[in-house]
Amino acid sequence: MNNAYEYDVEIYPNLFEVTFIPKTADQKLIDVYKAVDIRCLAIKNGKEGNLEELKEAKAKLLLAMGAKQFVIWIDYTTGKWRNDGPLIMDFFIQHKILTGYNSNNYDKIMLDIFINNYKYLDVKGFNKKESKHITQILYDHSCACVDFGKGYSRLLNFKKYYKRPFTDYDIQKILYLDKTYTSLKQVAICLKWYRIQNLPIAYNCRIREEDIYDICDYNVNDVLITLELERSQKAEIELREDISEEFGIDVRNMSRSSIGKAITTSLYEKFSGIDRKDFMDTKTDRWKIKVSSILSPKLKFQTKILNDLLRTVAQSTIVVGSTKDEDKFKYEFQFGDAVYTMALGGLHSQDKPGLLIASEIGACIRDCDVASFYPNGILSYDVYPEHLERNPFRATVGYTKDTRVEAKHAASKELKEYKKLFNEINTFKNNHANQSIIDDLQAKADALMKSSKRHKIKAEGLKIAINRMYGAFRDINDYLYDPKCTYKVTINLQLCLLMLIEVLELKGIKVISANTDGIICIIKPEQEADYKACCDWWQEYNNFELEFTNYEKYLRNDVNNYIAVKEGFQDAYDKLIDKTPEAIAELEDIYIKRKGLFIETIAFNKGYAYPVVPKALNLFLLYNVPYADTIENHIHSSKEAIYDYCISQKTDAKFNIIYRSIVNGELHNEELQKSNRFYISDVSYCSGTIIKIDKNKPSKINRIVAKCSVRPFNDYIEEDDYHIDFSYYKKECAKILYGKNKKTAGMVAVQGDLFGAMSNNKHLEPIESPEEDGLFEVDFEDDNVSFINPANDIPINNTIWGMYGFSSEEEYKRAIENGDDLTF
């Protein structure tokens, strides 16, 4: 018998409704239900059809799915009532596994309250103990729960006597969407769901009998969205089940962050021998941190500008939690052709847009990432929260890092062996070999696959744990909280990465991008030996390991928005015989890395904005397909393609949302819901705009998309022509490719000498007398690194004349007039 369901609860002053749909509901039935419901929406929007027949068809489909809907309702005026309470209790005779959205903070609690109160209810649903109807009791708790927020269940005094007849899984919590306050409607838009509907009747209204159907129908839509979400995240759900089995910790109802915490806690408890209850509520608060007290003595630079930076950083004091700019850790400076930002989130370069193709510049575009940068940094700089034991914590970090690497390599090795055996099995089958030989090989292959999967799960679980540690240092609610750890790790690692950038630039190797734990360089053929020497020295000196990737193309808008095409893609693409979308997508997964606005799949916690634009940009930049062609033709690729032109907008409750349009020559205002989906339409067909009006300042009106005609598309309506304004989407592509205006460069506009890639920066040459200025030199031939005492404190000067080492702009101008060399 199926005991796993998706569910959702709706509560009004005189109505309690709950819908359950089996997790195993046949997808074909769901698809038919959606098709029927789309016809219902079309009728509601003016198309012809028999709505009552379609409602009956929907009811039959829900029955075929195994859906359950229970209603408790009373009309205080007419005396009519409905009480499905006994049916709800029958439903819970067997323990159920329920999955909801935000259910941990609401639906689960409301079910608990109902089940606990059931024993006091009469046949109509009145609570004999409190002299209230159960719907009123639930409504009061519902309002209190929403107002209170997370943790309302702790206020319920019956829990110690109550045994819950179900297990609740909250998919919002599992996917960490509760932390970003992502609503189910926002998720539905990202899932390209056909029906985006907010509550049909205000939550504080009394429900009439004729309204019950609309509430139930609305709730079915929400439950189906939740089911669609869970099915789309199958890999995440299965990962939690596998990690639970592998580590012996139940993480099935946890976000990735909580999984990491659970694994780390288990390991620290094991290595320290301290019971978790004795350290889970500990932390180290700090007010001020002197940066000089946390800097590594190994941080040294050869150039004046970076030595000045080091001194300035060392002299600074961080005020934890301060909102003042002067108290924060943030520095901007120019080095080489790049402008860098040091901040709490890591080192980043301020990258200009452009296209870089290795074959055209006759050089290698190489990305080097530091393996396990932050975990290794924690160990290298001896970082541990002051309130925890040093050695057990270091053992926890070391075990997590090393075991993850071992498990990752073991999984990869076994997978290769499995593939080899798989090919052998197929060869034997084709040659009609003895079945016993095939069976033996198959058994070995199955064992390898099982072992590889276990190692992969272990590696993934430990990766989650290790990635979380750094963030936990600055989470005031976590037992790893110690802000000093955060700054000790990030500041030292950023300066350490700058050491690599410096030695590369001093060898004439251009660094064109830096992002947290890696850098991208342009390397001429004659520079390969120098590049290797620089990287080898840096790895040995800092005890870090670099991982290298060569790119055929590096196409970027900025540091966080780019397409990186790995070496070998074009050759693999040319050899691809069957260039189906599926085959190309598989190839792209192997060779292409996208970030930011070039990712076509929109994250649930991000605003939904026209996926057709990144699709058009990708096809243009990778396959030379004119972006205008994609914008105009994609709409004909499928019935669902209209979603790729849509934009979403969620507005605050303090605003009224109005769709203002011209209908038959007259101004027409239609009130919209808080979450809306729309697309840009041809003004000659549909002249309308979405405006938001501040309830407290009615005269203050803002348009959602200025200077454009928009058409709401909350309900999917199939049309032969949606009258899309293609020019809007083409302009969005053009802004990225050619710049928003004359002052803002685009990717294509600076294609020539990208990033000054082949230019010489003489001011980056080491000074001739390092001892005189308190700098140091690196001799790569004998690996002899000598450090000189720091020079006198000099503040950072980011002006052009300051970078060249002049004390004033006048001195710099005189040097130019005299024809002096502008070296350090």
Regions found by a protein language model. Give the residues of each.
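Short catalytic/ligand-binding loop motif for oxyanion handling, primarily in non-cytosolic enzymes
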Residues: L15, N105-M110, L177, P375-N376, ...
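Helical catalytic core of nucleic-acid polymerases
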Residues: K179-Y181, L199-Y203, D337-M499, E505-K507, ...
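Two-metal-ion RNase H-like nuclease active-site motif
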Residues: N2-I11, D170, R366-C368
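C-terminal, non-catalytic extensions of nucleic-acid polymerases
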Residues: K290, Q494, E528-F824
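Conserved DEDDh/DEDDy metal-dependent 3′-5′ exonuclease domain
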Residues: V36-T182
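Conserved "right-hand" nucleotidyltransferase catalytic core of DNA-directed polymerases
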Residues: E10, V187-N198, N204-N376, L500-Q539, ...
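Intrinsically disordered, low-complexity coil/linker segments enriched for acidic/polar
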Residues: D26, G46-K55, N431-N434, G805-S808, ...
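Short secondary-structure boundary/capping segments
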Residues: F20-P22, I113-Y118, S244, S380-P385, ...
